[in-house]
Amino acid sequence: MFKEREELIYDLIFSEITEYKINISEYIEDIYKYDRFIDDIKSVLKKSKVAIIKEKVDLEETNVIWNLKVKK
């Protein structure tokens, strides 16, 4: 069962939290397509005037972790 991408986007835009550790494997089935997932989220954030200050992607055997800091 995957988490809802829309809930993540809502949190990234409207939550007061600015630092996130996102396990992408909780949102998509094929973790090797993580770059497409990240690009989609970045596109939405840009349209919502949320700037990415810092980001790092950690690739693990079964997980892809996206560490993200945003400015709203």
Predicted regions and their residues:
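Short amphipathic alpha-helical interface segments
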Residues: 1-31
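Short amphipathic alpha-helical interaction segments
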Residues: 31-46
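Residue-level detector of functional hotspots within protein domains
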Residues: 8, 36, 52
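Hydrophobic beta-strand residues in large extracellular and virion-surface proteins
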Residues: 22, 41, 51-52, 68-70
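A short, conserved structural fragment
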Residues: 46-56
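N-terminal regions of proteins, emphasizing targeting and processing segments when present
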Residues: 13, 17, 45-48, 68
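Short, cationic-aromatic polyanion-contact patches
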Residues: 56-72
